[in-house]
Amino acid sequence: MEKIKILFIISNLQKENTEYKKTIDLFFKHFNDDVIELNYIVDPKREQLETLLNLNNYFCIMPCGLWSVKESHNDKVIIYKYNIIQTLQSQDIAFIGSDYIKSLIFNDRPAYLKMSGIAPEGKIISRYNYKKMHVDKILKNLFPANLTPLYSGNYISKVKYVANSYDDLMETASSIYLSDKDIDEIYIEKQIKDRIDISVIIIGNPPYLFDFTSILLHNGEVNINIDIPSDAKTSIIRTAYEFYYKFSFKDFAEFQFTYCKQSKQVYLTDINIHNILKKVIIEGLLQLYNMNFQQIIYLFLTVYINNKTEKGTIPLLRYLVKRLPNEIVDDLISFENKNLLYKKYNYKDICHELKKRILKPDESNRNELVRLISNTFKNLPVVQTPTSLYLGDENYSFLDDFKEIPLYPQEPQLILEKSSQILNGQMRWHVPSMLYNIDPSIMFSPIVASTFTNLYNPSAMSSIYCAGYIEMEKQIVSQLSSLIGWNAQKSSGVFTPGGKICLSYGIKAGINRCKRQYDSTTTPVVVCSEINHFSIEAVCYQLGLPKKNCIRVPLTPSGTIDFHKYEQILIDLFEKKIPIACIVFSGGNTTHCVVEDIFHGTQILKNTLRKWNIKYIPFVYYDLVVCWPWLFFKDYDYETNKLDIKQIVLDKIKFVTKTIEHCYLADGIGIDFHKCGFAPLTNSLFLTKNDEDLFFMTDVSVNKAKREPYHYTFCNSRGATDIISAWNILQSVGVEGFQGYIANMLTVANNFAALMPKFDFEVIDTLNTYGFSTILWASIPQKHHNIIECIENGNESIRLNDQYLFYLTEYLKKDVQQGIFVRYLPNYIEVSSRCRIAVIVLLPMTLNLNECNSYKIVEYIGKKKKEYDLEYQKNPNLSFDKMPDEVPK
């Protein structure tokens, strides 16, 4: 193996005692190794250093400071006007320790201590303002204080002063400023008495790190036995790691803390990111691991090499690790390098590697999660333009490299970066031109809340396993019950993975109520209107009811339930003694968002039950997954109109709110936070007016005081991220936040509806559309007829027009950088069993779209339609993707 050369750059600026310096000098002079040639230079001039670097091919440099001392005086030293780290970095010379930018930041001790938030109280006074300073609160709390002169030029103070009072400070400051014109400022720092000075040394590069602590005694000796409370020690170590990760320190750092015995407080007093020769580091390693100075050189070289990827360094790494304690090697060397070093491994090696990927017992490696996220973010697919419809380009070729599960553990950062490429081609819901579906822009807070929740993995099946999450769930239920108008003491609720599961709970509650209250062998039915969600038949089937037992009530021309036919269906069922398990009313959808009048519906039910002397009451479920945020307008003063909402928009809000404010009449309600609630999928909440309807879902025998979610939920494996996401949304957005959001999106929808006819679009039933959607229809350019005429012209006319609309939607999104993604809905109206008429839906959801930029969206659609019509007239058979037969409403 070829011998390598290492250069130490040493400075006499370091405050070590004379005996220790002699020890270091002796070591350098007598260092002898078959593989490493150790050179050192003390306080070089820049020319001297650069000449040495040019003449020698050093494997790496070990700088032990930022500056070289030019002259030393009693009270100050004069340094050369160059930064050692900057010089090395500018010439691309490899060195151990952190980079130049961090060196600059952490050379300004007052600044970074203040930034830390846990430093002793401090204040800077300047030559020009100190006489005008008053005895403010900060100054009062500082005494007794240490005073450190701060020079403007290339000087560093060697002395500190002490001030015991304000008058003492003024006198000392005057003396300092008079005695030396180069001193511009004085840093005043509260003196901590009865203290223990502790250094936490972290060595390595994440996640391959180890740490130890040393105490520098007042007599200059080092002790590794730290006599402070364990909670303080844990806090100190965790804080050190937090800074190590936060500032991405490289190779090592020493964090100096002071523990005040009297106040039991911990203070950060200094950070060393370059000098590996400090006594607390060398002596600490000697006492803890019985390492000599030569082994310490091996240690830092090992750290340096392990962070490199060149396989040519493996022989050198093998040489070094053989001479180091095994426990240090285990912590510092990656599994991949161990594999290259030893060509064999056992289960302990694997477990040691995997252990680095979970929290330590003291949780000092929490910030490893932040590092992984931060690095992965840098490798996400590229956002090509602000208006790009998709993230990156659709490309999943990386999956070809993972056809089989790897044999041994792989680098998690690499795998994360690979996996993030699966987002290529992902729709960007937050882009104003994304008008496809009811997917909101997700707020940051629920994502953060979900992340730290997942880190601790609470299981919300029981309060034993999930800290306070079930209490948080109960608080959300209580808040929303009050909003609905229920007695929060009697209501209950449970978070579910989606609105379909909420429907399942509602229908199951109805089936259970039927069994308890109605003696019949006839299979019960579920009644709902044609506007209700398409999944209800599937839910019935999954719960043991035939699909035909979902009875759909026809609609009125306004698109809501026909209450006359609804009443006739109830009468017919009661006449035939067919039990009704559940009646579902719609609380809005993704088309016209017509909400059904639950007040009228329950009055009809109540009267019919009385008339037919029915002794049980079917479970009434209000499917409010879309329009629940309109409840925040229940107490809005429409006359004052505090939020200055346009009247046409306000009228629609008022209509919906006045209809759904009777939701308290429902027995159960479903809410989706992932629709108009800013939360990631999936996040739904099923609520019941009376807790027994939920608690008797599966097991009626459980003692109420001992009841846990697993007694009444459909599944035992239950996370808690939906709970904390919803809680964060509710508490951070607030009533007026939801009001503002609804007003904004309805204003955009109103603009769309008002302006689209100018571009030969027909807006369908705008007067009976109350949500964010705008339903559009347009005629084939050669025909110039309206939707009614198209229907009257028969199936072929409808088919051709449907095809035209589909091609138009494809044309609008053809330019993925500037296009518009709208929704093609082929099954809007069923004309016959073999023919349905299609429409285009504009569904704005993001707050990045507002009244102003909505005009640009309309103009772009109009412009593109004009272009497309010209092309279509030339060639009606334009080539696009296959036209879908069905799109979920």
Per-segment meaning from a language model:
Residues 22, 26, 30, 34-133, ...:
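Conserved N-proximal alpha/beta basic substrate-recognition cap immediately N-terminal to
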